[in-house]
Amino acid sequence: MEIKEEGASEEGQHFLPTAQANDPGDCQFTSIQKTPNEPQLEFILACKDLVAPVRDRKLNTLVQISVIHPVEQSLTRYSSTEIVEGTRDPLFLTGVTFPSEYPIYEETKIKLTVYDVKDKSHDTVRTSVLPEHKDPPPEVGRSFLGYASFKVGELLKSKEQLLVLSLRTSDGGKVVGTIEVSVVKMGEIEDGEADHITTDVQGQKCALVCECTAPESVSGKDNLPFLNSVLKNPVCKLYRFPTSDNKWMRIREQMSESILSFHIPKELISLHIKEDLCRNQEIKELGELSPHWDNLRKNVLTHCDQMVNMYQDILTELSKETGSSFKSSSSKGEKTLEFVPINLHLQRMQVHSPHLKDALYDVITVGAPAAHFQGFKNGGLRKLLHRFETERRNTGYQFIYYSPENTAKAKEVLSNINQLQPLIATHADLLLNSASQHSPDSLKNSLKMLSEKTELFVHAFKDQLVRSALLALYTARPGGILKKPPSPKSSTEESSPQDQPPVMRGQDSIPHHSDYDEEEWDRVWANVGKSLNCIIAMVDKLIERDGGSEGSGGNNDGEKEPSLTDAIPSHPREDWYEQLYPLILTLKDCMGEVVNRAKQSLTFVLLQELAYSLPQCLMLTLRRDIVFSQALAGLVCGFIIKLQTSLYDPGFLQQLHTVGLIVQYEGLLSTYSDEIGMLEDMAVGISDLKKVAFKIIEAKSNDVLPVITGRREHYVVEVKLPARMFESLPLQIKEGQLLHVYPVLFNVGINEQQTLAERFGDVSLQESINQENFELLQEYYKIFMEKMPPDYISHFQEQNDLKALLENLLQNIQSKKRKNVEIMWLAATICRKLNGIRFTCCKSAKDRTSMSVTLEQCSILRDEHQLHKDFFIRALDCMRREGCRIENVLKNIKCRKYAFNMLQLMAFPKYYRPPEGTYGKADT
């Protein structure tokens, strides 16, 4: 017997009027007792002794489930089972589930209508509300067999929560069979005898036993309110599939939107505006420049101000979005939604097996991070950035070329300056406060903190880039002579001794000026260290004279420069504050001089990047910001969900703070036409996630939405946890240790465009991406094996042969095989075994993504949970016809059809083809 399903379910919660769900009159109805955050009601169906309308006809049966609300008395089509072919005793694998927020009561009536499907390719169920007892008009491809109805309270109060109802014709007269309705409670032990149901499966009898063992908690249910603050609008589906030993396993499939789809882009855009306003102000404060450079500065500021205004407008528009928490695929080209990820959802499968632990499997599905509004006529970021840097390197005399590494370094030093200067000032004031209190211990502690921060400050200026930037800025002042465009030294030059003879300087590209004193910066910079040494020496002297038995941590410095301590005159002990105050003032003055010079010179470096090819470089920055915003929203969503589900797993938490997390992206984009540009955008966006770190903090209020800090080169995402959850974390994480992620992307095009690329085009982009990211994955595995404790590694290796999987993955990447989906299966398996975060992406995360995640789910059921081999294809069809992914299609394009045609599907790998009747023409 072959099972196929009709693409006909509708999630009723999307179609009931809002007022109905919150009707004041609802209080007179009896609510269903339920577990918080669990579905209110789940049941499964089976029919027996169905009467065919035509003698000897083999029935192809489905059941349509409708809901009659006790107030409205209107019928809402809610969902459907799959189609079971060739039997009068169909047993349906697709169940019915009502999520926790659905307005259902004991008085709610459920209507079950049984159809005989004659033409699956035309069979659909349209959403509509009909008066009670009115049958829908005849639909193409099906014929009505019979119906039955019951109240929810009758089912819940029945013996063993099982109803056997007679199916009657539309006039209520003739009985055409029976239908069994059985309540499902996932994870509970079923009392009494197991329910034996026999069904004909491809010519053999298969006894399916419905029994479950006591489960272990999949994830702490205490965590669910926290997760629900991030996830919204869940769509739930229920299935039962037989195992290889003919027992039932139960599967709950869930798909949820995330409010982070809009929250993260708004956070990020706000940071961009703040960063760009600060940069613009620093450019304005560069001081007097020669006419050439001043004109460049004015031009840069004009364009930068326009860019800031654009970001502010986008932020204003995003703040108006208060409805849906996801961006549909049909909106991917909208300018105001550019920063928002496309169709971001959590795809979750919860499995309850007879003999295995309950398990959760999560995949984040999202459209490939790409700048759709900008278009792909000239390619994506990977190509555009390479071309831009090549052209900038060969620019004319009017600009100074700084490599991307040096530009990033300038931004890093500027950021460090802005962070460290106020910190040092604070610690200096604390030192004075300790002196006024005459507390030796407090004085030593304050000095230790001041020394550490000041040493970091001094170290920030050791880079040769600062020296060359100072000289470049000097030549740009009025009267400066620009004999040759200055450029920073390479890393090898930076590491060379700085005491080379001056004659060697003529060989580099740094300009010279007869009045420029190259040693002046060294003196200014060194004065900070000397000022600190004076403070250390004074503290040592004060504590020593006070009779302290221990010196401060700066004794070594005092020994190196004994003249400092010798030069300090003796003072009475009550004058500690007065003796330290002028030294602190000197330190602050020296720092101010260093900061002023360094900020101006490094800002001049940033001016060079902006001055070249305006507005192209700003448009590239915009494109990169857009792509990164989409990628980051998905990453933060995935990280929070992974943290919630693994919060009480000590091994995972140790891996989190010791190694970091692997984040694996599965790409399904072709290397043909516009999708090449999408893949180029996606590759850069995912690579940019390396500059993101996470920090877990305790939530001080009910607001647990993440907060982002930092700048374009380095972001920290602060994830807030309720106190009870926060206390369960290891000390290292609670103390604020930064948690790192290792993003990797593996792409295999599977559609008909990839066929064209493989035969007539170029697949080198895909090959390069896969090879590069394999090396990153291998590096992560190496770090994982080195840093995790030996006892953990020993147990881990017993359970997983990752080395063999990695070797197999490398062989497949190097094999040059067309549409080698084995690459994706292996990468996904490795990611799961390494406790990683899984993503699946295609252009809009709707069609190809749906085929991939459903295949992955069924493969997991087969490989990890003993799904009966004869039911693999049927399970796959169930999930594709009546599962969450067909609901995703409906949410995106208001049509229950995957956007494939027969010609396209001929090019798809076998297991990536949807079942008949679920695909066709759809406007996307």
Curated annotation (Swiss-Prot):
InterPro entries: C2_dom, C2_domain_sf, INPP4. Signal peptide: none annotated. Residues 1-24, 481-516, 546-570 are annotated as: Disordered. Keywords: Hydrolase, Lipid metabolism. Its EC number is 3.1.3.66. Disulfide bonds: none annotated. Residues 23-165 form the C2 domain. GO terms for molecular function: inositol-1,3,4-trisphosphate 4-phosphatase activity; inositol-3,4-bisphosphate 4-phosphatase activity; phosphatidylinositol-3,4-bisphosphate 4-phosphatase activity. Widely expressed with highest levels occurring in the skeletal muscle and heart. One of its GO terms (cellular component) is cytoplasm. It catalyses: a 1,2-diacyl-sn-glycero-3-phospho-(1D-myo-inositol-3,4-bisphosphate) + H2O = a 1,2-diacyl-sn-glycero-3-phospho-(1D-myo-inositol-3-phosphate) + phosphate; 1D-myo-inositol 1,3,4-trisphosphate + H2O = 1D-myo-inositol 1,3-bisphosphate + phosphate; 1D-myo-inositol 3,4-bisphosphate + H2O = 1D-myo-inositol 3-phosphate + phosphate. Strongly inhibited by inositol hexakisphosphate. Residues 1-13 have a biased composition (Basic and acidic residues). GO terms for biological process: inositol phosphate metabolic process; phosphatidylinositol biosynthetic process; signal transduction. Pathway: Signal transduction; phosphatidylinositol signaling pathway. Catalyzes the hydrolysis of the 4-position phosphate of phosphatidylinositol 3,4-bisphosphate, inositol 1,3,4-trisphosphate and inositol 3,4-trisphosphate. Plays a role in the late stages of macropinocytosis by dephosphorylating phosphatidylinositol 3,4-bisphosphate in membrane ruffles. The lipid phosphatase activity is critical for tumor suppressor function. Antagonizes the PI3K-AKT/PKB signaling pathway by dephosphorylating phosphoinositides and thereby modulating cell cycle progression and cell survival. Belongs to the inositol 3,4-bisphosphate 4-phosphatase family. This is Inositol polyphosphate 4-phosphatase type II. It comes from Homo sapiens.
